Amino acid sequence: MLGIVLAGGEGKRLMPLTADRAKPAVTFGGTYRLVDFVLSNLVNGDILRICVLTQYKSHSLDRHITTTWRMSSLLGNYVTPVPAQQRLGPRWFLGSADAILQSLNLVHDEQPEYVAVFGADHVYRMDPRQMLAQHIESGAGVTVAGIRVPRAESPSFGVITPGSDGQTVTGFLEKPADPPGLADDPGCVFASMGNYVFTTKALVEALHRDAEDPDSVHDMGGSILPQLTDRGEAALYDFSANHVPGETTRDQGYWRDVGTLDAYYDAHMDLIAERPAFNLYNRDWPVYTHSTQLSPARFNAGGIASESIISAGCLIRGQVTRSVLSPGVVVDPGAVVQGSVLHDNVHIGRGAVVRGAVLDKNVQVPPGATIGVNPQRDGELYTVSKGGVIALGKGQRVP
């Protein structure tokens, strides 16, 4: 089985964190990149030949993959970034389906019987082998993973209409305003998780049909899945049936699309709750990432942290509560950090206050400065989400 990870997304809704990098390369949970979650799921599930399709500002992502995800070449295993190569003419990827069409040489080289096509910017644990087993049993051309979400959230997702058997896909709507609810749960719909398992022949044929359609948007969810649904070749995999070793009742079925600042922030708060909704510390189904060569975190006299994740290399001289700190963060004496996410090498000066904020790497907060204290001033100087999360980009100056 070949794994293809779609990692070329621009991530406009996650600005300014994506101003200098692709969305899958954004830091999450202190030490991880978003792409680490899907790659860990595939590798833990014994899918060991993986191509990561990249395009938008991919240097940070390419470097992370090549320095972190080094598999055993002696066994023919690999995780490799594959940039847009203009194999079908002088054009970049027109959409996720076109990205795979232009990269079909990867499929032809491996000649797998099945292809897993997964997104790169979600936070979750999943054993793809269970989805593959259902796909093989169903005989479908494609199986799409779905998760139940409230109907009110439908405009944010592709919505799957299941058949009476609960497995056949009878319809697909891209971000509908008011879709019908499920027969057994009218308040919910099945949202597509952006994860697909294809029989290779069905995938290749669907991509070529899509390429010949002048009205297509060349998207996996918006084009390929509806096409195969109309042909009666699509099946649904209910994510709630998936189980991984070491999971708890709290994090079983956890999946978050962190494509907006509010969702990104909320997912971090899930990590530091007293009973975390997502457990980063499951050793039976680990999330892998790059190991930094830094000394352990240090707390000086007066340095306090509670309900927080503090990464290696951090120096805490002030007060940190309900926050996630990446490696190398410094919090000086008298400084207060509350409900915030600080990326690598952020420095919070003496007496400064940071509340409800996401600070990208290398941001320097001067002594006595405040973020998250004066809403009017914050709105004039920084990016502020609909939910009130304040975000500063990489290296952004704080007056």
UniProtKB/Swiss-Prot annotation:
<dbReference type="InterPro" id="IPR005835">
    <property type="entry name" value="NTP_transferase_dom"/>
</dbReference>
<dbReference type="GO" id="GO:0005978">
    <property type="term" value="P:glycogen biosynthetic process"/>
</dbReference>
<dbReference type="Pfam" id="PF00483">
    <property type="entry name" value="NTP_transferase"/>
</dbReference>
<dbReference type="InterPro" id="IPR023049">
    <property type="entry name" value="GlgC_bac"/>
</dbReference>
<keyword id="KW-0548">Nucleotidyltransferase</keyword>
<keyword id="KW-0067">ATP-binding</keyword>
<comment type="similarity">
    <text>Belongs to the bacterial/plant glucose-1-phosphate adenylyltransferase family.</text>
</comment>
<dbReference type="InterPro" id="IPR011831">
    <property type="entry name" value="ADP-Glc_PPase"/>
</dbReference>
<dbReference type="InterPro" id="IPR056818">
    <property type="entry name" value="GlmU/GlgC-like_hexapep"/>
</dbReference>
<dbReference type="InterPro" id="IPR029044">
    <property type="entry name" value="Nucleotide-diphossugar_trans"/>
</dbReference>
<feature type="binding site">
    <location>
        <position position="192"/>
    </location>
    <ligand>
        <name>alpha-D-glucose 1-phosphate</name>
    </ligand>
</feature>
<comment type="subunit">
    <text>Homotetramer.</text>
</comment>
<comment type="pathway">
    <text>Glycan biosynthesis; glycogen biosynthesis.</text>
</comment>
<dbReference type="InterPro" id="IPR005836">
    <property type="entry name" value="ADP_Glu_pyroP_CS"/>
</dbReference>
<protein>
    <recommendedName>
        <fullName>Glucose-1-phosphate adenylyltransferase</fullName>
        <ecNumber>2.7.7.27</ecNumber>
    </recommendedName>
</protein>
<comment type="function">
    <text>Involved in the biosynthesis of ADP-glucose, a building block required for the elongation reactions to produce glycogen. Catalyzes the reaction between ATP and alpha-D-glucose 1-phosphate (G1P) to produce pyrophosphate and ADP-Glc.</text>
</comment>
<dbReference type="GO" id="GO:0005524">
    <property type="term" value="F:ATP binding"/>
</dbReference>
<keyword id="KW-0321">Glycogen metabolism</keyword>
<keyword id="KW-0547">Nucleotide-binding</keyword>
<keyword id="KW-0320">Glycogen biosynthesis</keyword>
<dbReference type="Pfam" id="PF24894">
    <property type="entry name" value="Hexapep_GlmU"/>
</dbReference>
<feature type="binding site">
    <location>
        <position position="158"/>
    </location>
    <ligand>
        <name>alpha-D-glucose 1-phosphate</name>
    </ligand>
</feature>
<dbReference type="InterPro" id="IPR011004">
    <property type="entry name" value="Trimer_LpxA-like_sf"/>
</dbReference>
<keyword id="KW-0119">Carbohydrate metabolism</keyword>
<dbReference type="GO" id="GO:0008878">
    <property type="term" value="F:glucose-1-phosphate adenylyltransferase activity"/>
</dbReference>
<keyword id="KW-0808">Transferase</keyword>
<feature type="binding site">
    <location>
        <begin position="174"/>
        <end position="175"/>
    </location>
    <ligand>
        <name>alpha-D-glucose 1-phosphate</name>
    </ligand>
</feature>
